[in-house]
Amino acid sequence: MNPDIVNLESNLNGEGLRIGVVMARFNLPVCEGLRDACLDELLALGVEPTDITFVTVPGALEIPLALQAMAQNEDDSYDALVALGAVIRGETYHFELVSNEAGAALTRVGLDFDIPVANGVLTCDTDEQAEARMAEKGRDCARCAVEMANLQKAFYD
């Protein structure tokens, strides 16, 4: 790459970052796997335990409202937010509805409030697929939140 090009490198240093995490309780065993992997990775990246706020909500459709409340809370500001949940296909159209609406709402929170939102809401056909993906997806969301928080800071500093 041309050395004159401004290149903002990936930064996975979580020191000093405040992260909000919202987890759905529906499909709880999978969500707990996502949670454990995400929180462990946030700590491994240097985020202090006291700089992590963790909240649970009933299901995936409730996650965006909780994230929105975190995003607009000026007294307790966050650098990034994480959504964790699991939507597993059933026999009705409900799977598509929940998956699509939750995903769109998570994106809207990030854009409306100018805050990174890591989407860790798994959408899988089976419990087995969700269980196979939960650990890596949880870690990935932690890395995404830290990297994007640092990128936002680089843009605005």
From Swiss-Prot:
Concerning its family, UniProt says: Belongs to the DMRL synthase family.
> From the Swiss-Prot or TrEMBL record, what is one GO molecular function term?
6,7-dimethyl-8-ribityllumazine synthase activity
Sorted alphabetically, the Gene Ontology BP terms of this entry are:
riboflavin biosynthetic process
Give the residue range of the signal peptide.
none
- Please give the organism: Laribacter hongkongensis (strain HLHK9)
Pfam families attached here? DMRL_synthase (PF00885)
Residues given in the record as (2S)-2-hydroxy-3-oxobutyl phosphate binding sites: 91-92, 133
Class of the enzyme per the UniProt entry, highest EC level:
transferase
Q: Which SUPFAM superfamilies match?
A: Lumazine synthase
Its protein name is: 6,7-dimethyl-8-ribityllumazine synthase
Q: What is its EC number?
A: 2.5.1.78
Q: Carries keyword Transferase?
A: yes
